[in-house]
A protein has these predicted regions:
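Charge-rich, well-structured scaffold segments of protease-associated domains
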Residues: 1-76, 111, 119, 141-271
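Phosphate-proximal small/polar/acidic motifs at interfaces that engage nucleotide phosphates
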Residues: 136-137
């Protein structure tokens, strides 16, 4: 529910990204709707084929020839979506019988090819991107408000959405949100120590290596690179960023992108 409220608030209601799936959408769906959608979307010029493994040339030719038989279309699959630019909003949807409350903090950020993307990923990982993150230590271990909390920067078309999300115990939503902002403030005012930075770099290096440690993982990673116009050189750039990242850079990024007044908050459940 919190995610739906976020999307409705970022995108215009009635657009594909801003319209949550409702029961009546499914009830009103017909075979004709599905056929029309299939004809509009499943077009030869919209298909990228990725294959990995011991594949012969004749197999590749057969696959390509098969999909080339589909028709072609220049009609956009998803129309251009307008973004709501208001920041720092508060949305509350009560659920009186809920035993937990969902908190969601979010803001719109840059696209995948932005120059700060790799360094911001390191900042995000430190804040809430792995089990030893600041948010896990604060909101879970120290405060005991939740079993799990995480942050992510999700890339969509020409922008991204940074968010922090967690299900917290009843009546502790406000305290949990304040704890999140306390950790963001620490990132903006205190440089990360050498030991914590070393642990963070080790974790990220391992995560990047796991993303290409077998043929299936490598293909998934390559598909993502291809989607955003990148290639195998991206892996080298990721490791170069890990090597050169400094406490000063992390502090600067936190101040540049995570100012409290720009972050919207959602609570679903009880305060």
């Amino acid at each position: 529910i919190a995610s739906q409220l976020m999307l409705k608030n970022i995108y215009q209601l009635g657009t594909p990204l801003g319209t949550p799936l409702e029961r009546e959408h499914i009830e009103n769906l017909s075979i004709d709707n599905l056929k029309e959608y299939h004809q509009q979307v499943f077009q030869a010029n919209r298909i990228n084929i990725f294959a990995a493994g011991n594949i012969e040339d004749d197999e590749t030719h057969t696959i390509v020839q098969t999909f080339q038989q589909l028709s072609k279309s220049s009609t956009p699959i998803i129309p251009t979506t307008s973004l709501q630019t208001q920041e720092g909003q508060f949305i509350y949807e009560p659920r009186e019988n809920s035993l937990q409350s969902t908190i969601l903090l979010y803001k719109k950020l840059f696209d995948y090819n932005h120059t700060d993307r790799r360094e911001f990923n390191i900042l995000n990982t430190l804040l809430g991107g792995y089990f030893g993150s600041r948010l896990m230590q604060k909101v879970r271990e120290e405060c005991g408000y939740t079993y799990s909390i995480y942050s992510e920067n999700s890339y969509i078309c020409d922008h991204s959405i940074f968010f922090i999300e967690s299900d917290v115990i009843e009546g502790k939503a406000d305290e949990s949100i304040e704890a999140c902002f306390e950790e963001i403030k620490r990132l903006q005012t205190e440089e990360i120590g050498d030991e914590e930075l070393s642990t963070l770099k080790t974790y990220l290096s391992g995560a990047y290596l796991r993303s290409v440690d077998c043929i299936t993982s490598y293909m998934k990673t390559y598909v993502r690179w291809h989607k955003f116009g990148l290639n195998e050189e991206e892996m080298g750039q990721l490791f170069a960023t890990i090597k050169k990242i400094s406490p000063q850079t992390i502090l600067s990024l936190a101040n540049r992108y995570l100012q409290r007044e720009t972050i919207s908050t959602i609570i679903v459940g009880k305060h």
